Amino acid sequence: MKAAVLHRYDETLSAKEFVSFEDVVDPRIENPTDVIVRIGGAGVCRTDLHIVEGIWREKSNVNLPYIMGHENAGWIEEAGKGVTGFKKGDPVICHPLVTSGHCLACRRGDDMHAEESVFPGINANGGYAQVLLTGARSLIKLPKTLAPKDVAPYTDAGLTAYRAAKKASRHLLPGQYAVIIGAGGLGHIGIQVLKALCAAEIIVIDRAPGALELALSCGAHHVVKADGDEVEAVLSLTGGHGAEAVIDFVGEGDAIAKGLTMTRNAGFYYIVGYGGRIDIPTIDMITSEKTIVGNLVGTYAELVELMALADRGLVDLKTREYPLSAANDALHDLHHGRVPGRAVLIP
């Protein structure tokens, strides 16, 4: 099969080509619950750039060369003898984690914290290829309204945004405020999920005019340009109190300190983006009673819920398509901020 293969790390992201488009050996069924999916779309994620940089080298513990791509959807190509409920040609979306289902975390539905798991595209070969080896437990059948190439990024970007917005929606009442920092690939999904799940007023912050336009089209009530005065703008919109919930899809630079400042007393700050550090005096945490919540992908059940929203047209993913052979173009465009929404590779 053809695949876009990572052969070496590039800490400065300065190479002309990050991956090599080449022929590799097809994956094979090895376990009764294995499934081979013919890829219809593979999302290109900023995590992939971090992988190229080598940031995930110690966590993923993979040997190069290997194939990235952890946001995948397609059609059943082949299934192991123990797989039921699927047949060849069924359109599916792949939860990003392959788990056994036996550990306590799995039985509680906390797929992300399974004691034993494989994360195709992170610690095993992923979907920057014509076919992908995954497990039946990770697959969700797609309704006829949703094509694999249109939904692939929901498996990580969409699911991560959904989980954070779902958490926030539980604490948001009509007349209250939610701030979303970053209206890019994850943020524009988070806006729509919040809009679908609660009646809070949504304030979106971004530095790019195009991203702010996208935010308005996704249902934001207010947009604020990140020009240095965004904290004051949010405080003005919220009567000086700040927002009950702040979802930070940036998580680096000054976004963290500003996000916490925008969070009202007894409010919730959800951190999704990463790369920075949270540094806050404990006395400030005590007196403000703010809650900081981390977010890691989402559960199988939450991906089912997100697909239900997409099926009803309540969430619409903005994508830009690239042929698999142009994976380097997609990665460079993402690195330089030229991708509105999410990039998707089509084999």
Residue ranges and their predicted role:
Residues F268-Y270, I280-R320:
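Rossmann-fold dehydrogenase core element
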Residues A257-T261, Y300-P347:
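C-terminal hydrophobic helical "lid"/dimerization subdomain
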Residues A208, G275, G298:
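Residues in the short beta-alpha loop(s) of Rossmann-like NAD(P)-binding domains
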Residues G89, G175, A220, G242-A243, ...:
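Local beta-strand N-terminus motif with an aromatic residue
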